[in-house]
């Protein structure tokens, strides 16, 4: 069982790293940073929802491949923010991004571990490991809507 979990985590890491490392640049040049980041957020929302419904390892692996475009989001959002900040404030921006990322990772780990434990607790009338995925999909959906609303008209269609 643990080898299977380790294997799926390794596959996910390779897929995410491949998208982020090898496809972000070409995709953003062809379609524009905003479009590719938005596509990555939509893929993440749909795939997180799917993880909550899938019932087989093959289904999980298929969803992992579809999850790959989420790897575009962080570098492209960082790039878009970098272009809005003067050169003498780049360090502050990168420090702020790093701080927010670290707090979100800490909060997310605690929150989703609690969610998983709550919905898998013994004696619950309804147990499901899937609720955490559905909550994550909801969080990413809110992020996607906010991204679209806040950046409306700023960089859509702009190819960099």
Each language-model region and where it sits:
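A membrane-interface helix-boundary motif in multi-pass transporters
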Residues: 114-140
């Amino acid at each position: 069982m643990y080898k299977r979990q380790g294997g799926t985590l390794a596959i996910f890491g390779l897929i995410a790293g491949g998208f982020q490392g090898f496809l972000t640049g070409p995709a953003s040049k062809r379609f524009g940073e905003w479009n590719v980041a938005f596509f990555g957020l939509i893929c993440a929302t749909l795939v997180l929802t799917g993880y909550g419904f899938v019932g087989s390892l093959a289904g999980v692996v298929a969803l992992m491949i579809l999850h790959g475009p989420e790897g575009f989001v962080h570098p492209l959002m960082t790039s878009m923010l970098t272009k809005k900040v003067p050169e003498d404030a780049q360090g502050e921006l990168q420090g702020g991004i790093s701080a927010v990322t670290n707090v979100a990772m800490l909060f997310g780990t605690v929150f989703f571990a609690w969610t998983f434990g709550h919905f898998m607790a013994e004696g619950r009338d309804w147990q499901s490991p899937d609720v955490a995925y559905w909550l994550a999909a909801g969080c990413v959906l809110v992020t996607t809507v906010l991204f679209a609303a806040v950046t409306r008209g700023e960089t859509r269609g702009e190819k960099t």
